[in-house]
């Protein structure tokens, strides 16, 4: 990060003479090869989401989530009715392009266009969606929307510090760990220490390339098994990117 001094000799941050803010994401959908994200619609998505979430017999997909569990379709419908169409936190249903069915939700939140800060959160993926190309591409589409299309400077990922799957996902997706905010929230009758992860605009290019290579059809065999890991591809692209910067 560039640091400079003002007329008083004090250290100040880098100048942003051309910064005019980012755009609000709104509720516009996103589509890729495997996944499609559509603005959450109670009428269209509740039944499919309830069926998909019901694959989780134990209810563990709700442990680290501020919402749920939803034991009836009507309770999920009540939540989707309250969550859909909210500009402060636009929720999307994650659709499998092959089946056309919804099996997860994700949202943009903590949206601050004036500062160029936005977070991907509110994620709940049904067991059948987890660890699939559809799930990975859904997150990539949201990252692409925020960083490339809307011009955000900082993309955040936060989770309960004890939520090891979410922390592993953040690192796999190229986010960098920034620390833990202790006693940051309370939910479901317990304390939450929050782990913070972020990706900056200047870090996005090699991460984007890693995703694009991983999502390419040739990275998978006929059974859908990956040839190269996403984390390895991002690491490779980062090594090339920063080596080029050093030479320049």
For each predicted feature, which ranges?
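Conserved active-site tyrosine of GNAT-family acetyltransferases
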Residues: 169-170, 197
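Conserved beta-strand-loop-alpha-helix junction that forms the acyl-donor binding cleft
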Residues: 157-166
């Amino acid at each position: 990060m560039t640091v400079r001094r003002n007329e008083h000799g004090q250290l100040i941050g880098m100048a942003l003479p051309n910064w005019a803010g980012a755009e609000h994401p709104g509720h516009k959908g996103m589509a890729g090869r495997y996944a499609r994200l559509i603005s959450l619609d109670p009428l269209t998505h509740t039944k499919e989401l309830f069926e998909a979430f019901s694959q989780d017999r134990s209810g563990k997909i709700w442990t680290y989530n501020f919402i749920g569990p939803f034991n009836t379709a009507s309770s999920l419908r009540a939540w989707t009715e309250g969550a859909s169409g909210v500009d402060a936190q636009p929720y999307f249903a994650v659709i499998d392009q092959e089946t056309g069915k919804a099996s997860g939700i994700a949202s943009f939140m903590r949206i601050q266009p004036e500062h160029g800060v936005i977070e991907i959160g509110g994620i709940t993926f049904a067991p059948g969606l987890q660890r699939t190309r559809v799930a990975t591409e859904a997150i990539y589409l949201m990252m692409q929307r925020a960083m490339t299309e809307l011009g955000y400077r900082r993309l955040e990922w936060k989770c309960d510090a004890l939520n090891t799957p979410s922390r592993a996902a953040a690192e796999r997706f190229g986010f960098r760990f920034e620390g833990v905010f202790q006693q940051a929230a309370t939910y479901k009758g317990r304390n939450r220490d929050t782990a913070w992860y972020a990706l900056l605009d200047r870090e996005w290019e090699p991460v984007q390339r890693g995703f694009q290579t991983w999502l390419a059809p040739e990275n998978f065999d006929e059974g859908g098994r990956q040839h190269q890991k996403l984390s390895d591809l991002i690491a490779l692209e980062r090594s090339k990117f920063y080596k080029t910067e050093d030479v320049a």
